[in-house]
Amino acid sequence: MKKILVIVYPEMNDVEYTNVMVVFSFIKTIQTTCYHHSLKKITASNGVVEVNNIVNTINLSEFDAVYIPGGIGATKHLDKDEKLLKTINYFKVNNLYLFAICDTPNVLFKHGIITKDEIYSSFPNPNLVMSENRSTAKVTVANKLITARSAGCALEFATVIVCTFLKDNTLNELVHKRLFGSEIKD
């Protein structure tokens, strides 16, 4: 069983959270835990999603990866939350998987969690400093750092995560079948 810590915070993007979590739920060897150090309930940016299965205390050594949704909340809340940033940095420092989408990679770059030498995808936010190595690709895999550009890439991002994280490309077909009800056609 692989365990993924899911960092949640106010105004995270609904689509980025739900699409990725749905794909994770397809894979029986993945277990997710939603975490925030103090909040018990989170409402996402569009008010569509409310997360209330949040734990406030964790043992980081129990997790194999961390997933951080993006959205406006990344720049408004995550950017200023030293406890969450420290939690995310634990995964980087310990060479564990880190999955981030939209503005979250920009925030992680700002705080030095993503370095100037790493290639990553993110939302092209003109209000944030971005690395020269920022990619315009929808999804980027750079060793154990997997990033995506925006909510529109969330399903592809989630599929790349499960295939890369579990080192099993056949999961691509399983995810596609669960999402679209059919085999992948050329």
Swiss-Prot record:
GO CC, alphabetical: cytoplasm
Protein name according to UniProt: Uncharacterized protein MG029
Gene3D superfamilies per the UniProt record, alphabetical: 3.40.50.880
